[in-house]
Design a protein with these regions (language model features):
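Early extracytoplasmic/lumenal segment of secretory-pathway proteins
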Residues: 10-80, 357-369
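A structural signal for short loop-to-beta-strand junctions that line the ligand-binding cleft
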Residues: 65-70, 88-124, 151, 161-167
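Short beta-strand->loop
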Residues: 87-94, 107-111, 151-154, 247-266, ...
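Periplasmic-binding protein-like
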Residues: 97-101, 115, 195-204, 209-211, ...
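A bilobed periplasmic-binding-protein/Venus flytrap-type ligand-binding module shared by bacterial periplasmic
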Residues: 120-125, 181-182, 268-283, 299-303
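Ligand-binding pocket segment of bilobal, Venus flytrap-like solute-binding proteins
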Residues: 178-258
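Mature extracytoplasmic/periplasmic domains
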Residues: 275-332
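Conserved C-terminal helix/tail region of periplasmic/extracytoplasmic solute-binding proteins
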Residues: 328-372
Length: 372
């Protein structure tokens, strides 16, 4: 665990509050500095690797907590944090401005951001080239029809153009696995189970990247031509990625070559909470209140395309122009909490089998002919 002081204060007798978060949660440092300037309370930030290791640390230290406030508990860890009573109920100031669909009845955790995780694709790779009126369509050079759902990942035409992050190594990859399970649940009549769909994906040519950053920023090349070496034009991202992709450009372009596939999206929520048994509950509450203030909420969007939990926060110009309001289905956090690690084991088993090069064993069918 790495401990760093996120802010500083010139006061002689500086009060401190301990904040536990993780590397994959974007922490708005300007908002923490403003909190210190207003209150005189210095925020000591401790960082874990991801949401799972962060909640595990809270569980191990529950009798003598290592922090007063926790930030970045996602939908996959919400049940464990609540069920183990690692956090205390608290109703922060400003909660009335939060999207009502994100609120929890037990008030143990406070929503601070939300992510609509979706498939993303190139626009230009699927555009028809202009053709003269006296020209016949050239069938071999006609571009692919644009993918519009998860089923494209098992389509032999689209699978070789897709890259997704590995859920064994990446949180965004884990969200992809959760979305895959939701689209193709096991033990459901008429639905092919997700392990079988995964096998078809891998055998059809879908690439698994070691991280989401590798998948998005390196392998996904929306503007690449088909003649270039193995371009990937279909990947896993979010409804916010078209806006994120122009964040560091000196000027906003007229358009961006990234489209969101508004089908099969899932909504992931990031929460904050007051750590149970904290010796400084009052100041912990003040820090948690600050997470819903406008500056923190305005700065909470991250490289994954997350958005504020509040509904009244002004959008950036990039989001206004390129952001997509996707129809993302909320996760059943109570159901998923105890079983997503089992899905990871199944993913590993299926991917290892495909890597081995072994062909799937066909089922043995026995036919009994009735006697005359």
């Amino acid at each position: 665990m790495i401990g760093t002081a996120a802010c500083s204060s010139s006061a002689t007798n500086t009060q401190t509050i301990r904040l536990l978060t993780h590397k994959q949660f974007h922490l708005p440092l300007d908002a923490l500095e403003e909190f210190t300037a207003k209150t005189g309370i210095e925020v000591l930030v401790f960082t874990e690797e991801d949401a799972t290791s962060m909640v595990s640390l809270l569980e191990k230290s529950s009798e003598n907590p290592v922090a007063d406030v926790v930030l970045g508990i996602d939908s996959l860890e919400r049940r464990r944090a609540s069920e183990k009573r690692l956090v205390e109920a608290y109703k922060p100031i400003g909660i009335e401005n939060v999207d009502v669909t994100l609120l929890l009845q037990d008030e143990l955790l406070t929503p601070v951001s939300q992510l609509a995780a979706c498939l993303n694709r190139s626009k230009s790779r699927y555009l028809s080239l202009p053709r003269r009126l006296d020209e016949l369509p050239d069938k071999p050079t006609r571009p692919l029809e644009a993918p519009d759902s998860f089923s494209a990942l098992t389509d032999p035409r689209h699978a070789p153009t897709a890259v997704v992050p590995d859920p064994l190594e990446s949180r965004m990859g884990l969200y992809f696995l959760v979305a895959l399970e939701r689209a193709y649940p096991e033990n459901t009549a008429g639905v092919e189970p997700w392990p079988k769909v995964l096998e078809q994906m891998l055998r059809s040519g879908v690439e698994i990247a070691p991280s989401w950053e590798e998948a998005w920023f390196t392998r996904f090349q929306p503007t690449a031509q088909e003649s270039e070496d193995d371009p990937r034009s279909l990947t896993w991202g979010s409804a916010g990625m078209p806006a994120v992709s122009v964040r560091f450009m000196p000027e906003l372009p007229e358009e961006v070559d990234v489209a969101v596939i508004n089908s099969g999206c899932i909504k992931v929520v990031n929460y904050a909470g007051i750590v149970r048994n904290t010796p400084d509950r009052r100041n912990a509450g003040r820090l948690l209140d600050s997470f819903l203030e406008p500056l923190f909420q305005y700065q909470v969007p991250d490289r994954y395309g997350s958005q504020p939990a509040r509904t009244d926060i002004l959008r950036t110009e990039a989001w206004k122009r390129f952001g997509v309001k996707a129809k993302a289905i909320p996760l059943d956090e109570w159901r998923i909490g105890p079983i997503w690690e089992q899905w990871l084991m199944t993913w590993r088993q299926v991917s290892n089998e495909v890597k081995s090069g072994r062909e799937p064993v066909p089922p043995v069918v026995t036919v009994t002919i009735p006697s005359q």
